[in-house]
């Protein structure tokens, strides 16, 4: 087991009723007719009043909620969705659950799962949402994975989009749960059948297998063909051109993107994603000025882009001073963006742009972690591992670093290897250190490779066998989507398809 006290399990997983009236049988026919009209009018008035109390005529409320969601006004959307959801409208229940999922708060996501499940009996959209949510659920059970497969297949048969990529993710994440399914063969069948999502499922497989760079030509071909119907392809094509250094093709793509955004065919979130590709040093030569222009264009309509702008200025200080950086962060925090809390906590943690303040760093990082920001767990773990708050707190460090590592942050594995190797606040545990040093080799650095070599020399054959068992256990706990699960394509696959028919059409 992996713990500062030898008790921490590595592979265990992360933790109206219409009023009735009666007529006298002795009433004359003319009076009966008049009475009937009165009762009908009263009944209609009562029904209208009930609907008004619920939120102002059902259909306009649903439309208002949908429009508010597109604007990012989740408070208004939630009020209107709830009014209709309380009346039993399944599509409004779906909208309400979508808002809960978007918070990334574990308790809210749990409520969303229950809401989707309640609506799934009558709503194919709810089936698709629930299936996607179960695919993304940490430490899902075998029963939940099988349920996700069933739901996504049912939703696909009923015409719901954005179902095949989550299915592909399910098969790639948990091959042991679906031993009869070969992901590549399944994708080949989908492509042969002409399913429009199948090409993107193939792209996801390349990302997952770490062979994306070897298939840039096919990725380009797939996404060029799907660009008009699947706007996530703007991100994939931008990535391809960035990796190849094809400035002319990138400029042409950005022109298409701007035109599509101007006519409302592409959401602001997609523009934000492309801007982040342009500013990603790991993809090749950056174009941070164009990235800033794109983000400034969409930030008023997409509050998350204020944080993207802050991150851009942080990464490229020549684009703005500290006042500009903090102004962007403040706008992000005003919009309750967890990434803003993460970046502010990181600034206090590093002590470069702002004076170092471990207490403030902990406060903001904790807020970000509670909202689902995986990187916040990494920095919290380092705070506790290094004793920045006054004392080394090894168990807190293990908890947060393990959460970060299992969430896909590779640097957390190296930090865990250091923790168990150095033994600050705990006795050294070279077997545990070896496990995480091995896991850190998914994206090796000279430092992690050197540490692994040192640990290799320290372990006895028995210790090596025990450590290998723990390593296998931890790998099973994490699944096999280490390289692909955090890609934009994968994340989008688990979220709502913005091109789906608005919910009021189903009411």
Protein language model regions, located:
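Short helix-capping/linker turns of helical repeat alpha-solenoids
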Residues: 87-89, 103, 121-124, 137-138, ...
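Structural signature of tandem alpha-helical TPR/SEL1-like repeats
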Residues: 72-76, 104-115, 140-151, 175-186, ...
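Hydrophobic face of amphipathic alpha-helices that form TPR/SEL1-like repeat modules
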Residues: 95-102, 131-137, 167-173, 204-208, ...
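Alpha-helical adaptor scaffolds
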Residues: 346-350, 366, 370-409
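Post-signal-peptide N-terminal segment of Sec-exported extracytoplasmic proteins
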Residues: 63-114, 125, 162, 166, ...
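Terminal, low-structured helical/coil segments at or just beyond the last alpha-helical repeat
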Residues: 446-507
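C-terminal motif of bacterial Sec signal peptides marking the signal peptidase cleavage site
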Residues: 53-55
């Amino acid at each position: 087991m992996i713990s500062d006290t030898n008790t921490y399990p590595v592979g265990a997983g992360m933790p109206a009723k219409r009023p009735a009236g009666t007529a006298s049988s002795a009433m004359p026919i003319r009076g009966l007719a008049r009475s009937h009209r009165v009762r009908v009018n009263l009944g209609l008035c009562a029904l209208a009043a009930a609907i008004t109390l619920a939120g102002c005529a059902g259909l306009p409320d649903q439309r208002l909620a949908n429009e508010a969601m597109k604007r990012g006004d989740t408070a208004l959307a939630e009020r209107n969705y709830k009014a209709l959801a309380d009346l039993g409208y399944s599509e409004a229940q779906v909208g309400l659950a979508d808002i809960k999922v978007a918070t990334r708060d574990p308790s809210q996501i749990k409520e969303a799962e229950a809401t989707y499940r309640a609506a799934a009996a009558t709503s194919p959209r709810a089936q698709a949402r629930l299936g996607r949510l179960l695919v993304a659920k940490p430490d899902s059970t075998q029963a939940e994975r099988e349920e996700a497969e069933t739901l996504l297949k049912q939703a696909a048969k009923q015409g719901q989009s954005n179902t095949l990529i989550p299915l592909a993710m399910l098969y790639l994440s948990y091959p042991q749960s679906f031993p009869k399914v070969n992901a590549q063969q399944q994708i080949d069948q989908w492509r042969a059948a002409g399913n429009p999502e199948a090409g993107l499922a193939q792209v996801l497989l390349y990302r997952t297998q770490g062979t994306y760079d070897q298939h840039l030509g096919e990725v380009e071909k797939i996404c060029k063909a799907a660009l008009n119907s699947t706007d996530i392809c703007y991100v994939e094509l931008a990535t391809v051109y960035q990796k190849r250094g094809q400035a002319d093709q990138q400029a042409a793509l950005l022109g298409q993107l701007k035109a599509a955004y101007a006519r409302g065919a592409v959401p602001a979130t997609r523009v934000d994603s492309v801007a982040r590709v342009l500013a990603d040093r790991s993809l090749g030569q950056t174009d941070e000025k164009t990235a800033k222009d794109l983000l400034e264009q969409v930030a008023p309509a997409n509050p998350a882009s204020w944080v993207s702008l802050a991150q851009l200025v942080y990464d490229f200080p020549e684009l703005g001073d500290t006042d500009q950086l903090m102004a962007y962060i403040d706008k992000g925090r005003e919009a309750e963006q967890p990434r803003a809390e993460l970046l502010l906590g990181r600034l206090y943690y590093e002590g470069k742009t702002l004076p170092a303040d471990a207490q403030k760093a902990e406060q903001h990082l904790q807020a970000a972690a509670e909202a689902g920001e995986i990187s916040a767990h990494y920095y919290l773990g380092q705070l506790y591992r290094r004793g920045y708050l006054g004392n080394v707190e090894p168990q807190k460090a293990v908890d947060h670093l393990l959460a970060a590592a299992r969430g896909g942050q590779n640097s957390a594995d190296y930090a865990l290897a250091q923790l168990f190797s150095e033994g600050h606040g705990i006795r050294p545990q070279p077997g545990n250190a070896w496990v995480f040093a091995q896991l850190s080799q998914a994206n090796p650095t000279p430092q992690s490779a050197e540490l692994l070599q040192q640990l290799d020399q320290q372990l006895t054959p028995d210790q090596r066998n025990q450590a290998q068992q723990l390593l296998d256990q931890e790998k099973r706990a994490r699944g096999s989507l280490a390289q692909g699960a955090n890609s934009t394509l994968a994340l989008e696959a688990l979220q709502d398809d913005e091109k789906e028919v608005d919910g009021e059409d189903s009411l």
